[in-house]
């Protein structure tokens, strides 16, 4: 079930836009920044963030640029723009911060830690080590990738947002994609991830322009090189159940873990891509053990 309402909901002016943050706990305590994945928003951490705050942290969940209530994107240079947003937000909140990040947010947390090691104490990466190598940019043909992204961007900006008749219909759509999420969570994510539409229905808040440099703006070897720069402790949480988005498994998962200098892996049985929603108790146990090992 979705957990406690945030204690505070604020906006910060960051990197020439307005970033929505949701806060739990005492602002004088060490900061843990929660970063969601693509098409999601900060309220996906309504169960996990208050539990982390109860351990003596200031838990801050962010709506990434182009998602939730935060400012929109002006182009598709999503990855690095959002990483810069998170870096500036971390400095404002009181770096170094701990980071809990899911999916795309997990990859961005690693990019952030590799580029700005002074900003990050540790990372809990929830199924966010990147997509399979075969869908990344081909280093031998980057021009084709650029052209494909531009063609896709043109289609996106020409297409009006789809308006859904109800939250229930939006939850149904998410349920077809995120097949393991409970119904109450599908409704929760739809309620906080949508806004009234022009014809009395609902539209998703996430701006699809963010997808034009996905699944990754980087080639495979460049991604590994970035991860090798991460010096802070990293806990990677993955599920063992088939899901739409948990696409890195087996030997490839082990290779990516071994490539990060101070990483450790915990499998959470019976979960898929949304480990922290499907099994928050096991997620918290793994986090507490990790923080007990590496420090607050």
Residue ranges and their predicted role:
Residues 22-69:
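Conserved HGGG/HGGXW glycine-rich cap/lid loop of the alpha/beta-hydrolase fold
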């Amino acid at each position: 079930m979705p957990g406690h309402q945030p204690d505070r909901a604020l906006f910060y002016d960051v990197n020439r836009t307005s970033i929505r943050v949701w806060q739990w706990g005492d602002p004088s305590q060490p900061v843990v920044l929660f970063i969601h994945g693509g098409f999601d928003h900060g309220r996906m951490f309504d169960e996990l963030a208050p539990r982390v705050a109860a351990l003596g942290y200031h838990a801050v969940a962010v709506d990434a640029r182009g998602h939730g209530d935060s400012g929109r994107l002006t182009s598709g240079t999503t990855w690095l723009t959002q990483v810069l947003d998170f870096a500036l937000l971390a400095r404002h909140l009181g770096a170094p911060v701990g980071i809990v990040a899911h999916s795309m947010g997990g990859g961005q947390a690693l990019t952030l830690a590799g580029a700005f090691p002074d900003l990050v104490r540790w990372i809990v990466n929830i199924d966010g080590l990147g997509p399979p190598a075969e869908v990344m940019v081909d280093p031998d043909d980057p021009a084709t990738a650029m052209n494909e992204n531009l063609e896709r961007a043109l289609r996106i900006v020409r297409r009006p947002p789809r308006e859904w008749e109800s939250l229930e219909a939006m939850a149904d759509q998410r349920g077809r994609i995120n097949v393991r999420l409970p119904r109450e969570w599908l409704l929760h994510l739809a309620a906080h991830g949508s806004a009234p539409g022009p014809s009395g229905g609902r539209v998703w808040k996430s701006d699809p322009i963010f997808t034009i440099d996905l699944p990754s703006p980087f080639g495979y070897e460049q991604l590994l090189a970035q991860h090798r720069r991460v010096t802070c402790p990293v806990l990677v949480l993955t599920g063992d159940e088939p899901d739409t988005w948990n696409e890195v498994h087996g030997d490839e998962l082990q290779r990516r873990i071994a490539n990060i200098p101070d990483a450790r892996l915990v499998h959470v049985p019976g979960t898929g891509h949304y480990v922290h929603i499907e099994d928050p108790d096991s997620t918290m146990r793994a986090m507490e053990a990790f923080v007990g090992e590496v420090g607050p």
